[in-house]
């Protein structure tokens, strides 16, 4: 008889954004004329850059001709894109990453969720709290997390609280951990680590034999000096870290799907007998078995991001969204609400008004301002009492939403 993978039964009842959509749809049914402004899920609103679109068209035209048609491509990605990434994202910052260490994929969400498959189920996983849910839920599905308590805290995971009290900077684990998920600039808090702070994590991983899974999907939004764009800017990180990047938020690829993961050649992990194995080879084996690669037109489109025109156009989009973030911050100040982030990231992390939990604040904004954000409790126990807004809507909608919120009394 077929049975279910019971690890799936340990998942909380709903992925946070599914619950948000359910509540919004219910509100819309009851209020069909409502002008709802969505500032919750981190989806972009500006179109693809012109340089990207032109490259996309050219690649599609190639696919229409017998001489230039392409079928299955390399699972790791076409060399032209891997080389462009190595040169523009890493060599330009003095970081030594080769094209062979770069794996093209259809999204950082997929890669951060799938990477755990190549590691043993007895590995102890540490996550910052609040945390992007994919890191937690993929390990729940795999069987590493154990059951959850009433607060949604899984017994088998190590949580590293990030709160106002520690300026949202997690402390190094006191107990042994093997896999450490870090995301900076951070989703959901919008905060960052300095090079010195990140170096403490690299040193910890080198001393303890841990491995850092570093999500840098929002690095393009860094505005201030002294904040690393890549963990590999820190000495020794090649020995202890995997990095995830995405074209979704910097180049508008949320619907186009393209990202990449960097697995350095030096990175090795032992089996139960102590024999060392290349993580790059393990990830390559996983990808060649379960993934057929990103389409040729999409990879040509991603390559165009690195042209002078592409760089100028994505900078315009990033500046557009960061102007939205400035409007959000200033409006929250006028409303008397405490907030964090929104300077080096497109996310603003709001402290909910006293006596109001994060879902109550969600319902207040939805019902009284017709604005949708994301309750902090959906990102983990330490997210309770906080609320996330994103800067990814249009300028007009951002201004309108913040005017509505400013009119509320808290």
Swiss-Prot record:
Similarity annotation: Belongs to the class-I pyridoxal-phosphate-dependent aminotransferase family. LL-diaminopimelate aminotransferase subfamily.
Binding positions (substrate): 15, 42, 109, 132, 187, 292, 388
Task of the protein: Involved in the synthesis of meso-diaminopimelate (m-DAP or DL-DAP), required for both lysine and peptidoglycan biosynthesis. Catalyzes the direct conversion of tetrahydrodipicolinate to LL-diaminopimelate. Is also able to catalyze the reverse reaction in vitro, i.e. the transamination of LL-diaminopimelate with 2-oxoglutarate to produce 2-oxo-6-aminopimelate (in equilibrium with tetrahydrodipicolinate) and glutamate.
Single GO MF annotation: L,L-diaminopimelate aminotransferase activity
Subunit structure, as described in the record: Homodimer.
Catalysed reaction, written as an equation: (2S,6S)-2,6-diaminopimelate + 2-oxoglutarate = (S)-2,3,4,5-tetrahydrodipicolinate + L-glutamate + H2O + H(+)
Keywords attached to this entry: Aminotransferase, Pyridoxal phosphate, Transferase
EC number of the protein: 2.6.1.83
Name of the coding gene: dapL
Record-given protein name: LL-diaminopimelate aminotransferase
Species the sequence originates in: Methanothermobacter thermautotrophicus (strain ATCC 29096 / DSM 1053 / JCM 10044 / NBRC 100330 / Delta H)
